[in-house]
UniProtKB/Swiss-Prot annotation:
Record-linked InterPro entries: MinE, MinE_sf
Species lineage: Bacteria, Pseudomonadati, Pseudomonadota, Gammaproteobacteria, Enterobacterales
Family of the protein in this entry: Belongs to the MinE family.
Function: Prevents the cell division inhibition by proteins MinC and MinD at internal division sites while permitting inhibition at polar sites. This ensures cell division at the proper site by restricting the formation of a division septum at the midpoint of the long axis of the cell.
UniProt-listed Pfam families: MinE
GO terms of biological process kind: cell division; regulation of division septum assembly
Keyword Repressor listed: no
Keywords for the protein's UniProt record, in alphabetical order: Cell cycle, Cell division
Gene: minE
Record's protein name: Cell division topological specificity factor
Organism encoding this protein: Buchnera aphidicola subsp. Baizongia pistaciae (strain Bp)
């Protein structure tokens, strides 16, 4: 009986993992659908300005727009600088 429980409990864990991954994908797509049209150009221009003054790997720059509600948007910029 314990052997059967072992195999059945694994399926539940796999299903939960798949569900969590799907929720992440759906949330990311929703976020991308609500991005303003100007955001990709803004990201590119911010990146160009940073690269003008600092030699940096493009993967070290993260730009994200968060909306807390309909009236407030937060532009978050994270730059990891090497020493």
């Amino acid at each position: 009986m314990a052997l059967l429980d072992f195999f059945l409990s694994r399926k539940k864990n796999t299903a939960n993992i798949a569900k969590e991954r799907l929720q992440i994908i759906v949330a990311e797509r929703r976020r991308m659908d609500t991005e303003p049209q100007y955001l990709p150009k803004l990201k590119k221009e911010i990146f160009q300005v940073i690269c003008k003054y600092i030699k940096i790997n493009p993967e070290k720059i993260k730009i994200q727009l968060d909306q807390t509600n309909k009236n407030i948007s937060i532009l978050e910029l994270n730059v990891t600088l090497s020493e």
